[in-house]
A protein has these predicted regions:
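Beta-strand elements of repeat-based all-beta scaffolds
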Residues: 1-12, 16-33, 37-54, 58-75, ...
Length: 185
């Protein structure tokens, strides 16, 4: 760790040594993986990444709107991924590097209620009065449901095939146990 408490080196017998370098503002300006491959990033005065250059020289550029929302990523091969936001600053539409479009709609409480792709597939979501997601329905009609305790902690999720994962918490709300449908913790 450095004097600011940030990780500067991680060593692992399987993955080698990873190195982290930060700029004066605390942004991760250089990351070197265990194989010695480095990614170097440049940031604006707000700490938003403007570009990153990988170990083979590919440059990825990032653009933002006046509110700081990421609006476009342009990859080294010239392809791009763009995002558009509604008047509330919520992601409304994104177009991936292959031209596929996904649109998003929200309720008055800013909860995502649907996501649709350009092939007509739609995912829908429901919530309780506190904003906890109660269900998620995929385009094929399969639904996953969620339950919560009085503190708002997720206690179970049950998928469309009836498989249930459960979660337990201590009095402080810290997750103490997570068990999947097969009983693995």
């Amino acid at each position: 760790y450095d004097s600011m408490g940030r990780v500067i080196e991680e060593s692992n017998k399987d993955f080698g040594t990873k190195l982290y370098e930060y700029d004066k503002a605390g942004n991760l300006k250089k990351y070197t993986d265990g194989n010695g491959n480095a990614t170097v990033s440049k940031f604006d005065s707000l700490g938003q990444v403007l570009q990153s250059k990988d170990a083979v020289g590919n440059i990825t550029k990032y653009e933002y709107d006046a509110l700081g929302n990421e609006t476009k990523i342009t990859y080294g091969d010239g392809s791009s991924h763009s995002k558009e936001y509604d008047n509330c600053g919520r992601l409304a539409k994104e177009t991936d590097e292959l031209g596929a479009v996904t649109t998003y709609t929200y309720d008055a409480a800013d909860n995502l209620v649907s996501k649709s792709d350009d092939s007509g597939r739609t995912w829908t979501y429901t919530y309780d009065n506190t904003g906890n997601r109660l269900s998620e329905t995929n385009p094929e009609g399969g639904t996953t449901t969620y339950t919560y305790d009085k503190a708002g902690n997720l206690v179970s999720s049950t998928d469309e095939e009836g498989r249930t994962d459960t979660y337990a918490y201590d009095k402080a709300g810290n997750l103490t146990t997570s068990k999947d449908a097969l009983g693995y913790t």
